[in-house]
Amino acid sequence: MSTLPPLYATLNVALGGAIGAVLRYQMGRWMTGWLGAPAMSVFPWATLAINALGSLLMGVLAGVLFKLSPGVQDQWRLLIGTGILGGFTTFSAFSLEVWVMVERGQPAFAALYVVLSVSLAISALVFGLMLTRLFA
């Protein structure tokens, strides 16, 4: 629970969420331009990359927040963690993409995507934490 006033906490989450959603949209557009629409229609590369990057950044954030005072932690956790990274990463899109692959008759791709997404997300989070412990 936050120590910030409820309105202030809500505004931090809302602002961060808007920023994160725009960043996710722009990264998806950039990846489509970089890899091409055919590659993006075969495998959800953008969602995989976004969720892995978001996990890395969450690990960095967690490592940094650990060193801050509780009041400062709350503001940055709500703005960046819940807001920006919550708006940036997307578990609902991941779930839909897995199911679409299953419906297309591609259960092996679906399984690969699940394994890659979970292992990359956890590995990226741990790497982010290790970076902050190494450099902070």
Swiss-Prot record:
Sample GO molecular function, one term: metal ion binding
Regulation: Na(+) is not transported, but it plays an essential structural role and its presence is essential for fluoride channel function.
Pfam families the record matches: CRCB (PF02537)
Broad class of the protein's primary localization: membrane
Entry keywords, A to Z: Cell inner membrane, Cell membrane, Ion channel, Ion transport, Membrane, Metal-binding, Sodium, Transmembrane, Transmembrane helix, Transport
Enzymatic reactions: fluoride(in) = fluoride(out)
Compartment annotation: Cell inner membrane
GO biological process: cellular detoxification of fluoride
Ranges that cross the membrane: 3-23, 46-66, 78-98, 109-129
Domain of life per record: Bacteria
Presence of the UniProt keyword Ion transport in the record: yes
GO cellular component, one term: plasma membrane
Binding residues annotated for Na(+), in chain numbering: G86, T89
Membrane topology listed for this record: Multi-pass membrane protein
PANTHER family recorded: FLUORIDE EXPORT PROTEIN 1-RELATED (PTHR28259:SF1)
Annotated function: Fluoride-specific ion channel. Important for reducing fluoride concentration in the cell, thus reducing its toxicity.
Family stated for the protein in its record: Belongs to the fluoride channel Fluc/FEX (TC 1.A.43) family.
NCBIfam families hit by this protein: crcB
Name of the protein in question: Fluoride-specific ion channel FluC
